[in-house]
Swiss-Prot record:
Entry GO MF terms: ATP binding; magnesium ion binding; phosphorelay sensor kinase activity; protein serine/threonine kinase activity; protein serine/threonine/tyrosine kinase activity
Chain positions covered by the region annotation Important for the catalytic mechanism of dephosphorylation: 273-278
Alphabetized InterPro entries for the sequence: HPr(Ser)_kin/Pase, Hpr_kin/Pase_C, Hpr_kin/Pase_Hpr_N, P-loop_NTPase, Ser_kin/Pase_Hpr-like_N_sf
Family: Belongs to the HPrK/P family.
Any single Pfam family the record assigns to this protein: Hpr_kinase_C
Cofactor: Mg(2+)
Naturally occurring in which organism (per UniProt): Verminephrobacter eiseniae (strain EF01-2)
Any single biological process term in GO: regulation of carbohydrate metabolic process
Domain of life: Bacteria
Official protein name in the record: HPr kinase/phosphorylase
Amino acid sequence: MKPNVVSADALFEEFRGPLKWEWVAGLGASERRFDEVVVRLASSGADLVGYLNYIHPYRVQILGEREIAYLGSASPDDCKRRIARIVTLEPPVLVLADNQTAPDALVSMCERAQIPMFSTQESAAFVIDVLRAYLSKHFADRTTMHGVFMDILGLGVMITGESGLGKSELGLELISRGNGLVADDSVDLFRINQTTIEGKCPELLQNLLEVRGIGLLDIRAIFGETAVRRKMRLKLIVHLVRKETLERDYERLPYEPLTQDVLGVPVLKVVIQVVAGRNIAVLVEAAVRNTILQLRGIDTYQEFVERHRRAMEHDNGR
């Protein structure tokens, strides 16, 4: 689900400190919001903010040095028409950047049309980068997934599986081996662009890991600051299964890498059988190292198949 609400007032307060901007016009339109249809169709935050452009309506329009020069570089009548056309774009907010001064006609237009206009000394490029990152996250498709989300050897790994298989205990073992916890039990996932899923912990559960028989553990307090992560990009799903499930539902050596769809993005997946005596933490780290190789374009299974093919051709040639 993608949220579709952010008001001009909320946007102003969010970046009042970082962008040091002032509200210079349209003060009565604090509840002005992004168009819901545009938000729903937007593929990323880049679609919702940019330099002044008359063919891209309904987005935050940024007015830097060149844009202000364009608005004032014609005859008085043409300048009025250029400024008046901004109303037809129905921007949720206008942002005056590069320490520019708004023409009186632009301020008057914003007051009449009740379009909020903010002014900042920051560069237009910087403002666009900041707002795109914020809007991409705010309007991202999102879901919640059950499991333990970790940073293992620098890779974002989600550990999933049936209840009672020891996911949290495995997470604790991996933390003791120097890896980091992002979230336990409930993981918030966001699609921040077309190919990237980012996961973080709900605020209520931050730094906490529940282990049966012990209870809640504050990982940050026990292991230190380096044992927790604020967020990670999801690159691998490790799914724990019982022996009978593995034999029934999965191939021993799948010809193609397994993937799982998360918010429309295919994520690499490995399945590990849980039985007494197996060191699951070592297996998970090995799976992560193998995934890192795959992401670099090195596929051990395909290399084995090719090696086997060459051996057969060599034998047939004798």
